[in-house]
Amino acid sequence: MRSNLFKEFDSISEKYWKQQIQFDLAGKDFNSEVNWTSYEGVNVKPFFTDKYKSANNFFIPENWNISQEIYLTEESKSNKEIKKLITQEVYDITIHIHKKNINLDILFNDIDLTFINIYFKLEDLNDLILSKLNEYAKKNKSQFHLDHDLLGDYLSSGNWKSNYKEEVIRFKNILKTITHFKSVIQLKSSNFQEAGANILQQISYSMCQANEYINLFGSTIIKQVNFEIAVGSNYFFEIAKIQAFRILWKTISNSYGIPINNVHIIAIPTNRNKTIYDYNNNLIRST
């Protein structure tokens, strides 16, 4: 279907496109007016033809879900929020938890957790809560994920809660507790986007950070890493960025002898190009 989509239209040569653009420019220089170079050093033309098409060896995700965040206040209230989101076909839900203890039976009452992903963002990695979540996941075959980025938190704040060595040891112990979680690290590549890194820097820094997690916690962590990516305004470049993440993480995982079928990516709109003054502008910039 893709190859025959435009078969009813006559093909137009690259030469014709260039002639038409030069005519429309009314004497202005073609190269300086419509060609430009991105921050990544990519020379972008005003049009591309099949001549520039590369091999179609893309990694397509198995599926995708709409995501939403909620903040846990009262378990019964949050239960209603989750049920409402599910009716709206939101199947990835991040729950921010600031409490020291939670009643999971009330929070997830009458909710089938086998087909939705629940991400837990804890203010503090409370051992009691994590242990309860792990047992609940084991009992109910839940798709639980830990939204935590040990190195990313340090990157964004500049401080360890205690010190580097103690934080690493503590997280190693936590990994022994949450053995029934589907993922345990949500690497915030978004930190680099929000700090002004270009796409190549975002990808390379994120892969270095992911590899450092492998060095710290062993190669088995590979299948338990998610990537949170902040999406900018350059539509095609952002598509290429996400595709590059998939290719590189699969390449790295293969080099460690742990092949993965799907790279788990959480895509969010970047805050870097947003304004506090105009909601409609922000909506357009995220489209």
Predicted stretch roles:
Residues 1-235, 256, 262-264:
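Catalytic alpha/beta active-site cores
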Residues 206, 220, 228-287:
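Active-site capping/gating regions of soluble enzymes
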